Amino acid sequence: MVKKNKPLIPLPCDTSRAKSREWERVRVRGVLVLFFLILPLTAQTPPVAKKIPKIDSLFGDIRVDNYFWLRNAADTEVINYLKAENEYAAEVMKPTEALQTKLYNEMRRRIKETDMSVPEKIDDYYYYTKTVQGKQYSIYCRKKGDLKAREEVLIDENKLAEGRSYFEVGAYRISPRHDLLAYAVDTTGAEEYTLYIKDLSADSLYRETIAAIDGYMQWANDNRTIFYVMYDAMQRPYRLYRHVLFAPDRKDDMLYQENDERFFLGIGKTRSRKFLLMNLESKTATEYYCLDADNPRDSFRVILSRVAEVEYYIEHNADKFYFLTNDHAKNFRLVEAPVTQPGRDHWRELIPASDSVYLEGFDCFRDHLTVYERHQGLPRLRVIDLRTGEFYHAEFPEPVYSFWPARNPDFNTDQLRINYMSLVTPLSVFDYDLNTRTRELKKRTEVTGYKPDLYQTKRVFAVADDGTRIPMALVYKRGLKKNSQNPLVLDGYGAYGGSSDPYFSSNRLSLLDRGFVYALAQVRGGGEMGRTWYEQGKLLNKKNTFTDFIACAECLIRENYTAADRLVIEGGSAGGLLIGSVVNMRPDLFKAAIADVPFVDVLNTMLDPTIPLTVTEYEEWGNPNIREYYDDIKSYAPYENVKTQVYPSLLVTAGLYDPRVGYWEPAKWTAKLRAMKTDQNLLILKTNLTAGHTGVTGRFEYLKEIAFEYAFMFRVLGIQK
């Protein structure tokens, strides 16, 4: 799918983060440095991090960072501190171990452990994944010609993951003749992948491997040329290489290097298989180059040169390119142009700009375009018949839902495969007939013991300080009484223009069945209500994200869904920034908060260009080397604004190998909170020492993490079972 934002599928969490420039450093002589580390004196005495003041100055503003030293993962004292925090977390949560086991067993029982995906037909093969009872990972398989044919195992993640604490397969690509498989593997969580190529006929790997790629690759149509992308020192994808199997010199050609640090480089292929596409993308602009996939030794040529603040996304059909662009269209418009004359002078508009409809992405097939829109905050599917020019909107059965297209690799199809879910409907795979407008359910994820009629969803709106209506999606068990006694989890994100749509979670049933309400706040900074919604929650408008979330919490309390002493909030990554900010602003409003890999040290990170993602995210948060952005970021950055006050109970998580949010951000924040907060409420830092941004990879290990978070909530709320 051609999509402007990396998909949040299906969880509301980001695929990017934030960072920025070098700052002036003022070293102060004669500072008394406290070189001590208080480890637990008793079973439940929290560790106290030592203070080594690091003094920085910019614009005449002097800042003291006592916990900068935690950034050095090579220092054994840093690792010892993280381990001490983990030991404290385990000790504090020890009374909940039986409850954690109960929750884990509940959640695991709901899973159909032996299962398979809906097969995807590519040429003469059916490709699918399956899981097996008791196994943590997926198995990639195919059958030739017929689903009754012999099964061929392509990748067994369980075997490849043996002996590893972390394992993830990134992208994988079947070669045009279906005899080779290229796939990428990450074994640390640092998101640096190794490319492997497997001979499927011999069931063996080639000796040729390529380390430290970004996880994506594409085949040319000759079946022996593969294109891949390498990182720079800041883990920014910036170089495109061409690798030819069995080439005599074994030296890969570097085809392009992107020197503008705001731009990431990617490689793709049109569904028509005609063109390879090199895309260059910042937060506010894009540029595409194309190459005839039949002639991989040729050079890429630019389609449309980059223009500041102009984005476009491209697909191909016959003699035309299709562009989704914000050129003179804040909410994007769809245009077409001849392949030989793609310039703006030759554009023909198919969908004009609209103030009320936001175009998020599109797919191109031989006879149809499928366009993914948002209208009044809800996703919508528009189908355009390329033979007639007519269009229609598809209908969905529930008032609040989420859907996104599957890969749909067949260019000639008239069946669009879509994934659908809601807060009460498990993941469902449909084939939608683009001609007859009918849909066929191919599979609905089985959830053992689940009865959807027992649960109810509702869409409600809070009102922000400036009068803006903020949508929320709620789910709870039928018969709920609005008596202010219900425990409630309020989830939020609000960044990068990504849309946090309602999603089904079988794990969440362990909350709903205990009387919880779950609420998803679609605050500004996301893209749920269009491009303006995003712009009103970024850069100098970022604080709208936080005040919107506070308005949502106040609304839920005012409407008697819950009370402040029953309200738990959660968010991850950039959503963790949201959590960190609101507990500084309104700690009285929440009983507990869960901040997963939270981006909380915004100012220091955005002032340091040696940290991955910093420069590219100036366009999201602002460049603090400019005074107005410095002042604004400093005014809300959670780490800078920790106060001497009472805080709600907090569970904070981190990943030692996280390349998006450095583990030291949650660690520093926790250390500062311990030193300054005036309460005895729980404060737990749990660092995964063998994973990165997304945490553990095994499906059952993940359940243990969820059980721990739920048990933390239950302990704080006084729920015993």
Predicted regions and their residues:
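Non-catalytic accessory segments flanking enzyme active sites
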Residues: 80-173, 184, 263-316, 349, ...
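Active-site-proximal cap/loop segments of hydrolase catalytic domains
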Residues: 520-721
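Mature N-terminal segment immediately following signal peptide/propeptide cleavage
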Residues: 44-95, 103-104
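Cap/lid segment of the alpha/beta-hydrolase catalytic domain
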Residues: 158-175, 183-191, 201-206, 406, ...
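Asp-box/WD-like beta-propeller blade repeats and closely related beta-sheet repeat scaffolds
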Residues: 151-171, 182-230, 234, 239-241, ...
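Polar, glycine-rich mid-to-C-terminal structural blocks
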Residues: 238, 243-281
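Blade-edge beta-strand/turn elements of extracellular beta-propeller
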Residues: 157, 199-211, 247-259, 294-304, ...
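Glycine-biased, low-complexity coil/linker segments
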Residues: 22-27
